[in-house]
């Protein structure tokens, strides 16, 4: 910098300090110019915040945005241009649905429905990528161009105007020669005119900026139209899936026993008499009568068999007086101290342990068994 230029910068700094301290009064610009400056500052801040807000709307995850910015920086350092796209939430949801739809398989109606939904959400993710490209091309790029070019030129003229105004006020305060004052005044007027015209051009371009805002709305509207159509198609597909699943006959399922393929626990060697044996013994016993009390001989009744009474054979008289129950199901003892029996077995009740277990006796063997497996014939006293 030359000596004259250094002196000029020193004079400007001196004038600025004097104005700040209140020792000098700056040259006032007209109200129209001041209002235009205010509107330009507002426009600059508007574009800065609007671009940031739009990017956050398109890519809402800040951690992912930071990661992508780091990848872009590393790609520039390495000299590569390969970058991964922003992971859309619709695409991530589609991956989850497809994963479990494949695990359930084509035999599952739910699995096929999940695959249908995954395909639809993947289409929605592609549509959102198209919306991002559209918004970037027709909204973000024009705003960024306005900020980096027109507004940058406006601020350049404003900065130059401020410097020439300080130079003019400094020479005016120092009462320089007329030719220097005239030259400083001409430069001040020129800078003020350039700055004002550049601000006017930016502020009078509302039509273009409104058109850019409309492009943003149109891109969003087109996105929602296409995604709504995709969801309506998916809704119809799932309706058909529901009808097919409801029309299919319901399959019956019988659970397999845990011990179906294993040998059961060996039973006691004692075998309870078969119903036919019990019937034969009862018939044989009924063929004889006790001798009369007057000492007469034994009389034999003619053998006859009337068959078992309805509902099965009644227990002997001695058993009817004792608390007893009849087994409703087979019960296999699972631990020591339990009493196993077959369906229809008569069990002598010894005691009730609690609300879930009885203690009983069968063929001289005593043990525990569940209450729900038997029907009480003669209750405990």
UniProtKB/Swiss-Prot annotation:
Changing residue 66 to W: May increase membrane-binding activity in vitro. Does not affect its localization to synaptic vesicles. Residues 305-317 have a biased composition (Pro residues). Keywords: Coiled coil, Cytoplasmic vesicle, Endocytosis, Membrane, Necrosis, SH3 domain, Synapse. Belongs to the endophilin family. GO terms for biological process: clathrin-dependent endocytosis; necroptotic process. The keyword Lipid metabolism does not apply. It is a peripheral membrane protein. Residues 246-323 are annotated as: Disordered. Expressed in neurons and posterior intestine. It comes from Caenorhabditis elegans. This is Endophilin-A homolog. Pfam families: BAR, SH3_2. One of its GO terms (cellular component) is synaptic vesicle. Residues 18-247 form the BAR domain. The gene is unc-57.
